[in-house]
C-alpha cells in the first residue's frame, strides 16, 4: 500500500473545481465566477464533510493560479470567537493590496457561526469597508447563526450531504489507487457510517485499510465504532416486543463490548426509528425519548442509567401499542 503514512483526506482532496464530487450545481456557479474574473462575498452553509472548504480553496487556486497562496488566507473562527480576531487578523489581511496584479484577495473564514454577535457585526463593517480589495467566503454549519446583515451581503450556497453515488465514486477512486478490494456491501457500510460526510467516508476507508487490503463491512463498522444496522434493528425489536432483559443485554454489548459512544448509538436509533413502519403515536414517543436522552447526556448525566432508561421507555411504549 502506497504512502500509508499520508492522511488520505488531504492526499485525495480535489485541487480544482471540476474534480469535486457532488454539489454539481454549486460548482458550476463557482466556475462561472472564475470565467468572469469576478465574484461577490459568499456564504457556504451545510454539514461537515460536504466540500465547503475544498470548494473555497479550489476557487482561490483557479482565480489566482500560482499566486493563490499570496492572495488567499484561511482562518477558523472557532479558534478565536471574539471581536479581536476581526480587528486584528481579518482587517489586517483585508486592507493590504492584492499580489501579482489580482484585483482582489480572498479570505476564507471557516466555522463563521462560532463568532459572537459583536464579532459578526464588526466583520460586516470590515466586509463593507474593504469590498474593493477583498472578497470573503464564510463557511458555517448553521446559517441561522449568521446575522442577517452578513447574509444579505453574500451569495448563499447550501451544500447538501453527499449521496451514495458521490461516496461510491470517491471510495472506488481511492481503492484503485491504493490497490484495495471493496465490494458494494463495503460501500453501503461506508455510506451508512459517513451519512453524507466525505471526510468520514475517507477516514473510515483508510482506517480499515490499515487492517488489510481486502476491506469488509465488519472492518468498517469496527474501525469507526459503529453498530451495524441490523444490530440497531434487533435492539429496537427486542425493546418493542417487551424483552427488557434481552434489549438491556444487547445495549450493554454495544456500549461496553464494542465501545460505541452513547450519543452515536442514539443517532443510529433515531435514524432507524424514523424509517420504521410504526404507528405515528409510538414513533412520536420514541423520538421524544431519544431527544430527551440526548439532551440529558449533553448536560453530563450518567450514560449507563440514561441509556437503560431509554430502553425501558421503548419497552413501555411497545407494550402499550400491543394492547
From Swiss-Prot:
Annotated InterPro entries: AAA+_ATPase, ATPase_AAA_core, DNA_pol3_clamp-load_cplx_C, DNA_Rep/Repair_Clamp_Loader, P-loop_NTPase, Rep_factor-C_ssu_arc, Rep_factorC_C, RFC_lid
A GO CC annotation given for this chain: DNA replication factor C complex
A Pfam short name: Rep_fac_C
Sorted UniProt keywords: ATP-binding, DNA replication, Nucleotide-binding
Superkingdom, natural source: Archaea
GO biological process, one term: DNA repair
Gene3D superfamilies the record matches: 1.10.8.60, 1.20.272.10, P-loop containing nucleotide triphosphate hydrolases
Keyword presence, ATP-binding: yes
Residues reported in the UniProt entry to bind ATP: 46-53
GO MF: ATP binding; ATP hydrolysis activity; DNA binding; DNA clamp loader activity
Family, as annotated: Belongs to the activator 1 small subunits family. RfcS subfamily.
Assembly and oligomerization: Heteromultimer composed of small subunits (RfcS) and large subunits (RfcL).
Function: Part of the RFC clamp loader complex which loads the PCNA sliding clamp onto DNA.
Listed name of the protein: Replication factor C small subunit
Species this chain originates from: Methanospirillum hungatei JF-1 (strain ATCC 27890 / DSM 864 / NBRC 100397 / JF-1)
Amino acid at each position: 500500500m502506497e504512502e500509508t503514512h499520508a492522511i488520505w483526506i488531504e492526499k485525495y482532496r480535489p485541487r480544482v473545481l471540476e474534480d469535486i464530487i457532488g454539489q454539481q450545481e454549486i460548482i458550476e456557479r463557482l466556475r462561472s465566477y472564475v470565467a468572469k474574473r469576478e465574484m461577490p462575498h459568499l456564504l457556504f452553509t451545510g454539514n461537515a464533510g460536504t466540500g465547503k472548504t475544498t470548494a473555497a480553496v479550489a476557487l482561490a487556486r483557479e482565480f489566482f493560479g500560482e499566486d493563490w497562496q499570496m492572495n488567499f488566507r484561511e482562518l477558523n473562527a472557532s479558534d478565536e470567537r471574539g471581536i479581536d480576531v476581526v480587528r486584528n487578523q481579518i482587517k489586517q489581511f483585508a486592507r493590504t493590496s492584492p499580489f501579482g496584479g489580482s484585483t482582489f484577495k480572498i479570505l476564507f473564514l471557516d466555522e463563521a457561526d462560532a463568532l459572537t454577535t459583536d464579532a459578526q457585526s464588526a466583520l460586516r463593517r470590515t466586509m463593507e469597508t474593504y469590498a474593493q480589495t477583498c472578497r470573503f467566503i464564510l463557511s458555517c454549519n448553521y446559517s441561522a447563526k449568521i446575522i442577517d446583515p452578513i447574509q444579505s451581503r453574500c451569495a448563499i450556497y447550501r451544500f447538501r450531504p453527499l449521496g451514495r453515488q458521490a461516496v461510491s465514486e470517491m471510495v472506488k477512486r481511492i481503492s484503485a489507487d491504493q490497490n484495495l478490494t471493496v465490494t458494494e456491501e463495503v460501500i453501503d457500510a461506508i455510506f451508512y457510517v459517513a451519512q453524507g460526510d466525505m471526510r468520514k467516508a475517507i477516514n473510515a476507508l483508510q482506517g480499515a485499510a490499515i487492517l488489510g487490503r481486502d476491506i469488509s463491512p465488519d472492518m468498517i463498522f469496527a474501525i469507526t465504532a459503529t453498530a451495524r444496522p441490523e444490530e440497531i434493528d434487533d435492539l429496537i425489536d427486542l425493546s418493542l416486543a417487551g424483552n427488557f432483559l434481552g434489549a438491556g443485554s444487547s445495549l450493554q454489548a454495544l456500549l461496553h463490548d464494542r465501545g460505541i459512544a452513547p450519543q452515536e448509538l442514539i443517532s443510529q436509533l433515531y435514524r432507524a426509528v424514523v424509517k420504521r413502519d410504526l404507528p405515528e403515536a409510538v414513533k412520536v414517543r420514541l423520538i421524544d425519548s431519544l431527544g430527551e436522552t440526548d439532551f440529558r447526556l449533553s448536560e453530563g448525566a450518567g450514560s449507563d442509567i440514561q441509556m437503560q432508561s431509554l430502553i425501558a421507555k421503548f419497552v413501555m411504549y411497545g407494550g402499550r401499542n400491543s394492547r
